[in-house]
Amino acid sequence: TTEIYTLSLHDALPISFPSLGYGLGLRNEYYEQILEQSPAVDWFEVISENYLVQGGKALYYLDAIAERYPLVMHGVSLSIGGPHALDTDYLKHIKQLAERIQPALISDHLCWSRGNAHQLHDLLPLPYTEESLYYVANRIRQVQDVLQRPLVLENVSSYVRSKLDEFTEWEFLNALSHLSGCQLLLDVNNVYVSARNHGFDAWTFILNLPPESIRQLHLAGHRDYGDYVVDTHDQPVCDPVWALYQRTLEHLGPVSTLLERDDHFPPFEELLTELSKARELGATALARRSRCA
């Protein structure tokens, strides 16, 4: 068995990050309703790439919403595990946006998404090997040196596995966090999807992550085709994912929780109702945790 090293490549950047509460992904379908209604949402997560522009309608709404709500930034183009050099211009623009809106955190995905210098428009999993571990950890250090803050990385949903794997995904995430000082965005739905597709236990995945490194949770819907499950973000959260979320909060305590929707957008009131469900189930889970403490 290959040993997983946990010696730090550099001193981890210290951070204190209390829970922000319950948030929604900021999507242009809801800009005007957010500003008109000032809904009871604790924070919003913005897709970083949507705002790497000079002026325009998107930045106008972003600035207006940033005056009322805490924000976090979530990227889809970093390609932290990709074979090509990190895009320094992209990182510069990410830092400029962060200086503009002062996000509570900056996240992206543990994946590769560029080939031959072109975006593949997909988030592809890495081979979980020792070589990959050190390669990605070094690239994380480069990103953190530019951003001057810890990078937060999300587990992606997966549909194939590499024959080269030496670790499980959760072992890889654990070691990567220790090596690089990065933090983790635990997507509960992605864990469920990958567990269904690959036949592992979702709770084993979550239980073996370092609790102190988990800074945010994602909830989303998927499509279940029986033999496989696809992460689509176009459905309400299903009951098994809600149950896994509650168990996760009982284990971790309060963690900033985001509800994602990226297609088949419902009326805004329906999304707020689903967020209220997350808040209620979260409160129940945290109450159980307190009673057991």
Each predicted region: which residue ranges?
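Short, small-residue-biased leader/transition segments that mark boundaries at the very start
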Residues: T1-L13
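N-terminal pre-domain/capping segments
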Residues: A12-Q96
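Acidic-and-aromatic substrate-binding clefts and catalytic sites of carbohydrate-active enzymes
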Residues: Y31, S48-Y60, S79-D89, Y159-F167, ...
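Acidic (Asp/Glu)-rich catalytic clusters
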Residues: L35-P39, G56-M73, D89-A104, V143-V146, ...
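Conserved, mostly hydrophobic/aromatic
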Residues: F44, I106, L151, D187, ...
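Gly/Pro-rich active-site loop or hairpin
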Residues: G55, A85, L123-T129, L133, ...
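Active-site acidic/histidine proton-transfer and metal-coordination neighborhood
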Residues: D87-L184
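Non-cysteine beta-strand/loop elements that form the S-adenosyl-L-methionine
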Residues: A104-W112, L184-L186, P211-R223
